Amino acid sequence: MDQHIAESIGRPDLIRLDDRLVCLRFETMKAVSALAAVRHLLDTGAVRRGDTLLDSSSGIYAYALALACHRYGMRCHIVGSTTVDHTLRTQLAVLGATLEQMEPCSDLKLDQKRRVERIHEILAEHPEYHWMRQYHDDVHYLGYAAVADRIRETLGSADGLTVVGGVGSGASTGALARYLRTGPEGRASADVELVGVQPYGSITFGAGHTTDPDIIIAGIGSSIPFGNVSHELYDTVHWISFDAALAGSVDLLRRHAVFAGLSTGAGYLAARHERGRSPERTVLFVAADTGHRYVDTVHARHREAVPIADLAPQEVTDRGRLALPWSRMQWNRAAAPAP
């Protein structure tokens, strides 16, 4: 029996949607990494119960860190993106977390920069606070070891598995690939490919020169370098626009009854494409959260969704040729692109 709701929320479901297409569905994915990170910090003496944990978030991590702080008797201070909605603000308030939300801003790149600047201001005022640094501290990898074990046990083996998901801070997909490839005893053995999903405008894989007229998909891209992204883990990268991700989210709900967020819709599109390219492999895509935050901006617009059969990626070998609504590039486990 779980000792706290955060443990249940962080445990994913594995759902077979179709032949060799599997959804790894979380209620709140980052709960698993936040819980393990806070537990590790307590165990190593880096923090003590009652301390204040601080970080920046566009949504999912804010809730996850608030839950972890509630579980372990810590205080939580979040500098939130403009994308934090009323429901999440209310949850954070009731959980006792402090939320500073950025002023409305149509440029999420600027929003991200302002959040980091505010973090540094808070640390100057309160040097006793512990900055969780979800974008840079690989303590956030730890929680995904148990998820990798569950995937391996459920599927019987990780061999021949392709993992697809939003890159974001790098911890989730990067950690899953690392743990699945090495196995439970640290032996490098499994044939696991990793496919990262990015929005246009993200600098993580060198697409900062592109723009999406609608919005950069919160949580899976970045306008600043992230230390937790290990580029050498990724075999392939897909860049997917808001409109294409919307179509994926709607189709996932309509076809498979999975109600999930916008990044999941993007991952679903990429996963279907990868399965078509390699029918001998099992493709697993990550659904990081439920669709409740996206009811008005995505699911209520279901009549606008393009049929996914009409969508296919443009194959590129040069990032200078990236184009909306969807591009795909073999990354081949290369190093990070030059700034």
Where are the regions that the model predicts?
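PLP-dependent amino-acid enzyme catalytic core
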Residues: 1-339
